[in-house]
C-alpha cells in the first residue's frame, strides 16, 4: 500500500492512495478461505466447497467486500498516521477502473480528501464575565394566576329572577337544525348543545343573534359560512339555523380556596399557591438562562477567530436555507426578510451558518479539554422522552432510535452542548442583575438560529 500527501492547503488535505492488485488478491484468497467452510452449495457436502468454486460463484461479491475493507482501513491509517482530526466524513474519489480492479487486473487507486478540525486555543472559562438578568415572582402575579384558575373553574347555573334573557358570557343549552336553501346539510344538526355566547365557538354571527334570547324561545339564526371554511361544500354559502333555546345559564366564577385546590389534586390553597409560584419562577428561570446563554455565545463568538471547515459551513447553510425556502413557500418569512433579495438573504444566513459552526467547534473543544461526555443513561433518557411523545408507537420509536446512530447523534448534540454551557457557567464570573418582567421576557433582535 502506498500513501502520498498530494496537497495540504488550509484545512483541506488530499492523499493519493494505491493498493496493489496483488495485495487485493491476497486479501481475496484469505476471505474465500474464511467463508468456504461455512457455505452450503448444491452438489457438495457442507463445508467442503472447493475454494475455486467459491471464487467462481462469489468472487466479485467477495472482492467488493475486500475493497470496502481496504478503503476503511486506509482511511483510518491516514488519519491516525498523520494525527488528523477530521471535521467530517472523508471523501474517497477512485481514479482506477473499478471493473478492472474487481476483476483483479488493476491496482486500486484513489484520492482521499479530508477537511480537518482547525487548531485553536479556546477561551479560559474562568476569564469570562457575564451578567444574568433575573426577575423575582411577585405576590400580585401569583394572585393573578390563582384568579385565572378560579375563572377557568367557573360553573354555569340557570338564570333566575326577573330577567332570563341571555347575555354575553352566558351558556345556552340549545337544539338546532341548519339548512341551506331549505335543505338540511350534514353536520348541521344537534340537540343539547352547550354554547357560551362570545366564545367564538360557532361560525361568526351565530352567537350574536342569541343574545337576549330566553328559555323556550325559537330563534332563526341567519349566517354565512366563511369563504375559508374547512368544509368546502359549505364555504361561502348562506345558511339558516332553526334554534330552540332550552336553558340560559349565568356564569358563576369559582373561588381560589381549598376546595379549588382539592379539585386540582392538591391538599389546600397554600399548596396550590406554592405550586403556581414555583411554576412562574421556573418560567422566569428558563428565560434568564436563555438570555445568559445567548450572552455567553456572543462572548465565545467574538473571542474566537479561526478558519472554518468549508464543507461544515456549506452543510449548515444548506439546512438553514432549506428552512428559509420552506418558509418562503408558505408565506412565513418575517416581514423584514420578505423585502430582501435572495442574494441578501443568502449572505445573512451564510453568516448565521458560520456562527453556528464556529460556536459548535468552540463548545466541542472546551468540552473535550474538560472531559465532558454524554453518558449512556443520559442518551437513553432522551430517547425515552422522545419516544413517549408518540403514544402507542413509543416502543417502535424507541427501538428505531436504538438502531440508528444518526438519530442518536441528533439527540446527543444538544445534551452535550448544555453540559458544556453548564460547565462554563460554573467557572465564569456571573453577576446577577434584577430586571423587570418585560425586560426579561422581551425577545432578542437576532435572527432565529443566531445563537448557535
Swiss-Prot record:
Q: Extract the SUPFAM superfamilies matched here.
A: FKBP-like, Triger factor/SurA peptide-binding domain-like, Trigger factor ribosome-binding domain
Outline the extent of the PPIase FKBP-type domain. 169-254
Q: Which GO terms describe its molecular function?
A: peptidyl-prolyl cis-trans isomerase activity; protein folding chaperone; ribosome binding
A GO biological process held by the record: 'de novo' cotranslational protein folding
Would the keyword Cytoplasm be found if you checked this record's keyword annotation? yes
Q: Which Gene3D superfamilies match?
A: 3.10.50.40, Trigger factor ribosome-binding domain, Trigger factor, C-terminal domain
Reactions catalysed, semicolon-separated, are: [protein]-peptidylproline (omega=180) = [protein]-peptidylproline (omega=0)
> GO cellular component terms?
cytoplasm
| EC number(s) from the headed UniProt entry | 5.2.1.8
**Keyword Thylakoid set for record:** no
Which top EC class is given? isomerase
Keyword list (alphabetical) reads: Cell cycle, Cell division, Chaperone, Cytoplasm, Isomerase, Rotamase
* Protein location: Cytoplasm
Its UniProt domain note says: Consists of 3 domains; the N-terminus binds the ribosome, the middle domain has PPIase activity, while the C-terminus has intrinsic chaperone activity on its own.
Q: Which family does it belong to?
A: Belongs to the FKBP-type PPIase family. Tig subfamily.
| Stated role | Involved in protein export. Acts as a chaperone by maintaining the newly synthesized protein in an open conformation. Functions as a peptidyl-prolyl cis-trans isomerase.
Q: What protein is this chain from?
A: Trigger factor
